[in-house]
Amino acid sequence: MKLSYQGIQDKQGYAAAQVALPQYDWAKMAEKTAEKPVWVHFGAGNIFRGFIAGLQQRLLNAGLAESGIVAAETFDYDIIDKIYVPHDSMTLMVSLKADGSTQKEVIASIAKGIKANCADEAQWQQLTDVFTAPSLQMASFTITEKGYALRNMKGELMPVVVSDMENGPKQAHHAMAVVAAMLYARYQAGAMPIAMVSMDNCSHNGEKLRASVMEIVAAWVKNGLVPADFEAYVNDEARVSFPWSMIDKITPRPAEIIEKQLMDAGFEDMQPVITSRNTYIAPFVNAEVPQYLVVEDRFPNGRPALDKAGVYLCDRKTVNDTERMKVTTCLNPLHTALAVYGCLLGYTSIAAEMKDAELVKLVKTIGYKEGLPVVTDPGIISPKAFIDEVVEQRLPNPFIPDTPQRIATDTSQKVGIRFGETIKTVSYTHLRA
């Protein structure tokens, strides 16, 4: 079986492989998207394909949307050429349950993948056409926190950013300059409203996106490359909003065991590829089942019915409280503790650590005894239920190929936020028992 528009016409074969198919016609969806795009997403990698695209799939399956998502890649163009194009932008999603079973579904809600490359005139024009469409409601992002950075570790502007600031919208290479260039195209087409929604796993992500885009725009204005009114447009949150969000879903690199299962089931061309930018990516995505997305509800041009797809829509304070709950008490401190001790004790699997009674006692103490008494309750997600799921389902899942070595990366930069807030607020009197 092939993963493509023609391939999924083999409904009998897909049914035999126990793979759910989209309940809509991909070609018609792609046509509707080309006519009236609603949603463009920057960052065409696994978290987008395995989580965000699935949200739109739910809406399409339920008849709550007609168009799909346009994926734009600013960093690794090989992803488009080697993964999107051969498979009609479809993804074989494999959800890994704690009991060892899997749930498989073809995610077909991505209408097209575009290389956000100003040197490729045709691709650049396609992206510009999307951004100048009055129908466009949102641009979302999963480009990692590094994707927003304009400066190096010394605080100096990166050479590519300096070049972008000097050359203007037509020669934009850094991701933030590309975004600013697309907003300039939208401004020129009538200064239409849009929401710019960072969905990256970092605190105050919307503010990080806004600050970086505004710095590029301000430099262009200063250098006489764009009018000052464009800066006013981007700075007006009634027209260009930058909502905050909180995202949570473990989406590790493609696992060899999953590749083998899919090949044994009759699928062709499931092998991962390593791109020229060292991205490890496959036609399939494997990830855990639990997932959370909390988004500040500020969309000046309307939005898809995300609340009908399991997304929590709320105000900024609630987003921040949910992020604080996850990062400072209910998930990240537990993860970091396991990562550090896992490396020291020679473990190569988080799930294997959760079979060690002493390590389980450690994470339960950090979570339940130290964290929960001082947790920030966001009101939309129960901290107790969240941490129960982490300890009982997510961390012990042996089918999530996550390692303490990966999580331990940059621990020195994470200790303050992951443990410091609890240390500052906890009263240890309740620990004496």
Which positions does each model-derived feature cover?
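Substrate/ligand-engaging "lid" and interaction regions
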Residues: 1-42, 46-432
